Amino acid sequence: MLTKPSARILSFEEAAAAVERGAAFVDLRPIESYLEVHIPGSLALLYEFGPGMASRARDCLPLSLPLVLLDLGHGEPAHAAGSLRGKGFTVLGRVTDGVNEWAAAGGSPVSTEIVTQPQGRVLDVGDPGAKPGEDATRIPVDRLWARASELVDDEAITVASGYGVRAALAVGILERFGHEEVAVWQSG
């Protein structure tokens, strides 16, 4: 018998407590929406039906990282949860309208500036279509979690972006590791 995927609905307080204990918010919204406003350190995983999103998560994030899904109605969080669980992740549940709930609880959502000229260190995470240049630091997004500490915390970082999916995930990883000055450069 086939079972329908599910994701427990969490109150924002439950979700925030889980994140305080080490879980991560996963933002399922379109990349443009994520870059415009998001919870600092939340991880952008564009929801797409099929194996793409969950495979990207498996390649880029530790399986030991518990996940809390954020959605504003653009994706199907139950299917996203099922896909992520199928790759070995623990999905604690989902929060509807999480970014607004974060702000209502006194959190300060952040925006990621999209720049036309790079500022500070240029980071090439392997985003298809990006043209980061010869001087870019190359850390593929699937290695960034393990190598983010190699980057100086107080240094401005510009992530070279093509299509943006990997670049947006890199923004969240960098923020999670304490990098506050992160921009995206559409270099493609």
Protein language model features and the residues they cover:
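Cytosolic catalytic domains that perform sulfur/thiol-centered chemistry
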Residues: M1-G188
